[in-house]
Swiss-Prot record:
Entry membrane topology: Multi-pass membrane protein
GO cellular component: membrane; plasma membrane
Residue intervals passing through the bilayer: 94-114, 128-148, 166-186
Function summary: Controls cell proliferation acting as a negative regulator of TOR signaling pathway mediated by mTORC1.
Annotated source species: Danio rerio
SS bond partners: none
InterPro entries registered for this protein in UniProt: TMEM127 (IPR033331), TMEM127_TM (IPR046795)
Entry keywords, A to Z: Cell membrane, Membrane, Transmembrane, Transmembrane helix
Region described as Disordered: 1-23
Protein name in the entry: Transmembrane protein 127
Protein family membership: Belongs to the TMEM127 family.
Gene Ontology biological process: negative regulation of cell population proliferation; negative regulation of TOR signaling; regulation of TOR signaling
Amino acid sequence: MYAPPGNAVPANRRRRGGTALPKQPERSLASALPGALSITALCTALAEPAWLRVHGGTCPRQELGVADVLGYIDDKLIDEFCINSQSILLLRVIAAFCFLGILCSLTAFLLDVFGPKHPALKITRRYAFAHILTVLQCATVIGFCYWASELILSLQQQHKKYHGSLIYVTFAISFYLVAGAGGASILATAANLLRHYPTEEEEQALELLSEMEESSETYPADYDIANQFQPPPAYTP
């Protein structure tokens, strides 16, 4: 006996009427947002000329930064004892680490936004390797900034404007922007590391269910599996 075709419920309708399969996207907007803030802060720090503030020496400039040592260097900065060869080298190293930090942060941001499924890229994003590198770059920049400030302070103390001048060197806005970029990258790292991810077995099961769902959706909505088994024609001698 064959059941009438009209009594069977289409398989595709049964699937569509049920609950949707759980999706596990690799995107992470929670870490992409602080990653974007980190990129913005580092780019602004490079564009901002104020890294160190100088007071009390013979240098007429009140603010110094990496923009003063990239490309052409004004001879007055050296002649008026604002900077020397060592501080020039340190400021260039600071600029190089800022560029590396921007590159690492941009890589992490793209991984968080697009969420690639490639195994190597997936591991890189889940364990926040690019964000961690950004934090290290920012910490390195902060360390070199302190070193450069000590060198410039020593140079100003050797060339005081007046005998009793109070000389000090403080950090300017770019220094704090780099520190803020490092803090934002720490938040992005925490968002990636604290997020719950499915195990390998769960991922395989989800991929299998997704493939089954996609294959069922290739049939028309009114397709009935029972219709493909038509009863044989009546026997005629």
